Each structure stands twice: as structure tokens, then as C-alpha cells.
Amino acid sequence: FVDVSRKKIAAEVEVEMAGLDVSAERKKEIVERRLRSEINRGVQTIQYQVVTLMTTNGQAPFITVFMYLGEARNPQEKADLAIIIEETIRQRYQGVKNEAGVWITPAFPKLIYVLEEDNIRPGTPYYYLTELAAKCTAKRMVPDYISEKKMKELKLSKGETPGHGDVYTCMGCRSFLTPDRFTDAGVGNIANAGNYEPGKHKYYGRFNQGVVTINLPDVALSAGGNIEKFWSIFDERLELCHRALRCRHDRLKGTLSDAAPILWQYGACARLKKGEPIDRLLYDGYSTISLGYAGLYECVKYMTGKSHTDPSATPFALSIMQKMNDKCKEWKTAENIDYSLYGTPLESTTYKFAKCLQKRFGVIEGVTDKGYITNSYHVHVTEKIDAFTKLKFEAQFQHLSPGGAISYVEVPNMQQNLEAVLQVMKFIYDNIIYAELNTKSDYCQVCGWDGEIDIVEEGGKLIWRCPKCGNTDQDKMNVARRTCGYIGTQFWNQGRTQEIKERVLHL
């Protein structure tokens, strides 16, 4: 599209400059300046349309923008893509204006920037984009980062060797498709997709059928700490999840393309005929269905008395992950449905799970004594650990969450220490598929405070309070925090708020 606009503008300039003594170089400068202006307006339009559009449940659409230079088909297209990426990051750094006319951090669209050989080190052609991304992350918490190196090493289709896998975006904040197997199997263009290329792996347009999450601390507590009972109950709960996932799958079977034409007829997911069922898209790996899990830390803590970061407890934690992966593989082989293991974000369900555990088992120190349970495989938010050790440790678990997972490090204000941000980004590139940096981005509309707004307890309830003027009116403040994979700006329930309050810094 950039080159289409460039040619259109060039034709207009030729007409305008006809008969004038204007050099070709000068005309080119005019064309590129106008092109940049058009890109600026286009990116701005997308940003403001996303943050002002509401879905039927009153939320902004959960949209993710994937910025990967490796998708370009030729050098000119890569250079043009770099222009769009640069403009997108610059505008996110600037932010959007709130009611008071102050630039604040928007929640959407989520931005993902791929770290690759062309941009990861000083002297590489697009390192300037990586420096700009670091600057933006330090202020606005995005973009998040995917490592081309680790994806190519770990996201492998049948027959591929490490280093030759596929690089593709997640859906939403963390849900990853399984590597394309239907193309390798010769199934063909089952979605009648316009972007299908014979023999080339396909990711855009595929989808997920749904998620069912197993509460791992509940399994451990139900077993009373007995290891034999644990594995027995674990098997029972996994089969219960399997039945629930089949309910989701069977509910989709028989759905006609007319139910959502934009998805099934006009190319978002497929180009099926009117009245055609979507059933064939539910098999052969075109779509995935996810077994989610939560609270690995609390599960291991109860069973072993130690954090899963303890070397003596880590093997048990990994064996739990492997067990869930083995079940997904077993179901997939039997049913030709792509089950995959997914690190559930638990944006608000964390509070529900925690309260249910307390009701069933009481308050147990280190296990059920919080208003939340830990996201997926993550290190507990209160555990003191440095950023690099945390990412390295969690990488082994992320590899065992092929259906989706994300790791993060909590950092202070890094706007004056961008070199440290770049060091973390380089570490991500070398060690983990997908990670993000969390900071704070707040604004008090009463007094103009733009530092961190505090979480304090008042009357047995956690509230947000401006440290400068004492404002506690949530309608008169802008607070942006990483909920899990997304940035949240609409405040949270008491469990998630407690989790946010208790996060320790890793850098």
C-alpha cells in the first residue's frame, strides 16, 4: 500500500510540476514528504478508531499489531514496512489525548515488535527501530517482543530442523497457533483463503476454538499433598477439561458461514459459500483448541513446600507441564483436533479461582492466602529475582506452552536508562520466544500528577490514590497497568488489584 501511494503521489507531483524547472531529486523529496504525511494520518486514524470503537460488551477491540520486517517480500517492501513501523512506534510513544488534553498511554492496539538479525545490534540496518522501540517501551509499556531466533528454533512443523521454524504473531495477547500441519499434509486451501500460497505455511486467518482452564492449586489441595493422589486427581481433572473442550468444539460443529459473514465468507477466517458449514475448519490443524492452566507456583508450593524456582522443585513443575502436553498430544492424535497447552492469563478469573480455593480449603499460607493465584507458570509476583534470571527460568516453561504464553519483567521508570532496556531486549532475543517489560503510566486529572498512582487499603478495600493530592475518584485519573498480556486502563477487581500492588521490581 505504501508503494501504491508513492506512485499515486508521484503522478500528482508530475502534473503539478509540469513546465517547471524542478529536478528529479527535488520531486522525489516532495513525494517522500507527502508519503510520510499520508502514513502519519493513516496510522493515527487506526489508533483513534481502535480506542474509540466499542464492542458489544463495552470494551475496545482486543487488537494486536505485528511488526515483523521478515514478512517483507523484497528490499523496497522492507524499507516501506520500516516506515510504517517507525510511525506506529512514534505515535504510541506520543500517546493519545485524554479529556484534559494530556497525552496518556492507550491500551490498544497492542504492539508486538520482532527482534531479528537485521535490528538487534548496533550497526544492523534497522537498529534505529529497536532503539525507538526501547524508548517507547520505557514510557508506554509497548511494544512487546518476539524473538525471531527462538521462534525459528522452537516453532517447528513436521520435518523442520531448529533454526528453520516459522515466525508468526500470537492471537490477542498470547494465544499461539500450532505450526501449520495441514499444508504439509497436502490438505490444500480448505478455507478457500485469498492469502493461501501452495506449499507455504499459513497463519493469518486461522483461529482458536476456545479455552478451558484447569486450576492446578485445586488439584494439589484436593490431593492433600499426597503425590500418588495428585497424579490420579490430575488425570481426572484433565479428562473433565477434555469433556468441556469437546463441548466447545461440538457447539461449533454445524455452524453455518451465515452466522458471521465477515469471519466465514468475507475472508477474516475463510471464504466459504453462503449456507456452508464451517466444520472442515475445525480439523486438520487449521484451528486450535486450548487446554489452559493456572497457578503452577501455588500447586508446586503446596506439594513440595518450595517455589518452583527452587532447583529441587523445578523438575516436579516441569513434569506437570509435560503431563498436560502429553494429554494434548493424545487427544490430538485420536481426534485430529489441534489441542494445545495455553498459559491462561486469568485477567479477572484469578480472583474467582482464589476465592473458590479459600472457600473449599481455607486460608493456607503461601498457597491460598491471596486474592489471586499466579498467572500460568510465572514466578510469584512477590518473589525477589532479577530480570535475566526470571526470563531464563521461565523460558523452559514457555517452550512447554505451545498454545500460548508470555513472560514479563517488572521495571521502574527506565526513560533515563534506555541502555538497560536494550540489554533486556537483547536477552529476550537470545533466550525466550515472547516477553514484555512492565512499568507504570498514570495521570491524575485533578492535580496533573503524572507519576505512579498508589494502591492503598482503606476500610478493608484496595483503592487507587494520587500521592500528590489524595484524589481517589477513578473517573478523574488515568491508570495504565499490565494486566497480564494486555495493558489495562479500566481498573480491576480486588484480587487483580492486590496482585498488581504486590509486584516486586526485577531490575
For the regions a language model picked out, list residue spans one by one.
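Contiguous, well-ordered alpha-helical segments that form the cores/surfaces of helical PPI scaffolds
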Residues: M67, I289-Y302, Q322, R482
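Metallocofactor- and cofactor-centric catalytic cores in central/energy metabolism, strongly enriched
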Residues: I39-V43, Q47, K301-Y302, R496-E502
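Conserved catalytic cores of very large enzyme subunits
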Residues: F1-G285, K306, D310-K468, T472, ...
